[in-house]
Amino acid sequence: ATGEDGKDADSIKITQDENNVHFELTDGTVITISKTGQSADPNVIQFEDENVKKLCVAIWDTDGDHELSYDEAAKVTTLGATFKGNTEIQLFNELQHFTGLAALDDTFSGCSNLWRVTIPVNVETISTTTFNGCSQLKRVIFEKGSKLKLIAGSSGNNSKTGGTFSGTALTS
């Protein structure tokens, strides 16, 4: 398919869940369109990965609406072992809304199918085991204004030899 600008649209990834259709563009932008034609609640996080949503809602949905609001996410101060070893999750860009987090410990250790995550702006430290075993990890996005001070165990430009990002698919 060719778009209006004449560029190929074959590289657009289209996924869906029970409520929405998600279009991921080549630059990483995701456009979400409701299947019902109703606009989504602007106070509720629209998760790309249904597995991530299920885990988050099960633990941090404090008002019982089976959704996670931006306010509920912002109040989370630790993720604990919620995602550790989960081979189902693939995307977690919504992590950026968990602004109460200051550190990521072995949060995603063993998440072998996780390939993209967005780190919240207030995270100051990432441990050596945060992404241990994330062999499909290709993209880690740091928000503008990131307060990150330490990526433990990183060894300069050669972090593939050991440390936080060893064993991932990250190339730079």
Language-model region placement:
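Collagen/collagen-like triple-helix sequence repeat recognition
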Residues: 1-41, 117
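Acidic, glycine-anchored loop motifs typical of Ca2+
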Residues: 61-72
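Structural signature of tandem-repeat unit edges
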Residues: 70, 74, 89-102, 112-125, ...
